[in-house]
C-alpha cells in the first residue's frame, strides 16, 4: 500500500492503517513531500525514519509516487496528481472538517472518500457514491495514561486541557480567568496550541504544549489523560467525544461552530464570549462529577463509530 505524506499531521491517519496492513502481511510505502508550514515532513525526517524502523515501511520521495501501482492513500485529495491513476486506486481520507471546503475539488479525482459517518456527509451536503462511511483510522491507537504521564513528565493530579484558540480569536478568549477558575478546582491546567499559533508566556498555564508528538498525536494524548477540556469551537470536539472527555466550549469564532451537532449533548457546556464566574464554576462542578457515559454512548452511536476503522477500511479494499 502507498501513502502520500505531504504534511506531518497526516501521520495520525496513516499509521494505524500501516500497522493494520503490516499485521496482514502487507508492506507499505510512504512517499514524503514537503510544504512551507510548521508540519513540513522534510523537517522531521529522523522522526519518520524512527517510525519506519519500528513499523517496517519504506520511505521514498514524493516524486517517485507515479512509478508505483496499487492502493494509494492520501488526505483531502492532496497531491492526487502525483500518482498515476491508470494503475492505482486512490482512497482519500477526510481531515476533521477540511472536506467541507475541499471535497468538491477532488471528488472526481479519486476512487473512494472515507468519512467518519453519514452525519458528517449530511452536515455539509457532501454526498457521492464514492463515499465510504467507515470511521476514521486516526482513533485506532492505544493510549495508556501512565505512559503518557511519563512521556510528558506529568503528575497524577486532576487535569484540565485548554485547547487554545487561533491567534485570530485570542482577543475574545478570557484565558487568564479560565485558568484561575480551573486551578481553584484543584485542576492542573495543560495548554495545547498549534505551532503556528504560539501563546505569550503569561498564557502558558501550568504546562504548555505545541506538537511534540505527531503519532500518537499530542492533543489526543492530552485529552485522554484530562478530566475536562476547554475548547473554543475547534474540531477537537470529535476527539473529546471519541475519548469520552467532557468539555466546556466557548464559541468565539466569527462563524458557526464546525460539527455543531456534537455540541448538543450533556457532556458539553456551551458559552459565548461573555460568561459569569458562577456559570463557569457550576459547569466545572457538573462535568467533573456527573456520570456522562450514557450521553457519550448516544452521541457516538448516532454520529460517529466504534471499533477499528483501519480494519473496516482494509477489509473493504480487499473485498472490492
Feature-to-residue mapping (PLM):
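Donor nucleotide-activated moiety binding/catalytic core segment of transferases
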Residues: 59-65, 195-243, 247, 254
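Catalytic donor nucleotide-activated moiety binding site of glycosyltransferases and closely related
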Residues: 29-51, 163-168, 180-215, 263
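Active-site and donor-binding regions of nucleotide-sugar-utilizing enzymes
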Residues: 2-145, 169-171, 197
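Catalytic binding pocket for nucleotide-activated donors in carbohydrate/polymer assembly enzymes
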Residues: 107, 126-127, 133, 235-303
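C-terminal alpha-helix
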Residues: 283-290, 312-320
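Active-site donor-nucleotide binding/catalytic segment of nucleotide-sugar enzymes
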Residues: 2-10, 14, 93-96, 134-199, ...
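Hydrophobic/aromatic ligand-binding patch that stacks against planar heteroaromatic rings
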Residues: 20, 82, 181, 222, ...
Amino acid at each position: 500500500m502507498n501513502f502520500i505524506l505531504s504534511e506531518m499531521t497526516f501521520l495520525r491517519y496513516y499509521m494505524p492503517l500501516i500497522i493494520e496492513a503490516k499485521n496482514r502481511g502487507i508492506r507499505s510505502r510512504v512517499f514524503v513531500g514537503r510544504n512551507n508550514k510548521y508540519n513540513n515532513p522534510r523537517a522531521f525526517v529522523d522522526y519518520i525514519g524512527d517510525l519506519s524502523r519500528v513499523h517496517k515501511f519504506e520511505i521514498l520521495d514524493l516524486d517517485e509516487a507515479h512509478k508505483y501501482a496499487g492502493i494509494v492513500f492520501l488526505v483531502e485529495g492532496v497531491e492526487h496528481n502525483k500518482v498515476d491513476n491508470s494503475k492505482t486506486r486512490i482512497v482519500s481520507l477526510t481531515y476533521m472538517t477540511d472536506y467541507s471546503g475541499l471535497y468538491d475539488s477532488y471528488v472526481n479525482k479519486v476512487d473512494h472518500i472515507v468519512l467518519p459517518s453519514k452525519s458528517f456527509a449530511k452536515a455539509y451536503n457532501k454526498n457521492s457514491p464514492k463515499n465510504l462511511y467507515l470511521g476514521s483510522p486516526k482513533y485506532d491507537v492505544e493510549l495508556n495514561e501512565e505512559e503518557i504521564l511519563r512521556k510528558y513528565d506529568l503528575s497524577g493530579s486532576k487535569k484540565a486541557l485548554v485547547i487554545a484558540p487561533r491567534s485570530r480569536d485570542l482577543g475574545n478568549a478570557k484565558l487568564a480567568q479560565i485558568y484561575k477558575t480551573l486551578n481553584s478546582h484543584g485542576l492542573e491546567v495543560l495548554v495545547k496550541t498549534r505551532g503556528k499559533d504560539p501563546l505569550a508566556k503569561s498564557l502558558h498555564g501550568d504546562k504548555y504544549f505545541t506538537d511534540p508528538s505527531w503519532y500518537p498525536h499530542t492533543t489526543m494524548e492530552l485529552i485522554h489523560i484530562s478530566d475536562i477540556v476547554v475548547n473554543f469551537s475547534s474540531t477537537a470536539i470529535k476527539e473529546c467525544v471519541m475519548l469520552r472527555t467532557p468539555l466546556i466550549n466557548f464559541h468565539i469564532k466569527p462563524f458557526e461552530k464546525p460539527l455543531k451537532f456534537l455540541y448538543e449533548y450533556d457532556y458539553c457546556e456551551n458559552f459565548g464570549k461573555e460568561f459569569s464566574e458562577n456559570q463557569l464554576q457550576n459547569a466545572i462542578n457538573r462535568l467533573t462529577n456527573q456520570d456522562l457515559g450514557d450521553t457519550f454512548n448516544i452521541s457516538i452511536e448516532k454520529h460517529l463509530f466504534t471499533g477499528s476503522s483501519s480494519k473496516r477500511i482494509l477489509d473493504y479494499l480487499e473485498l472490492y
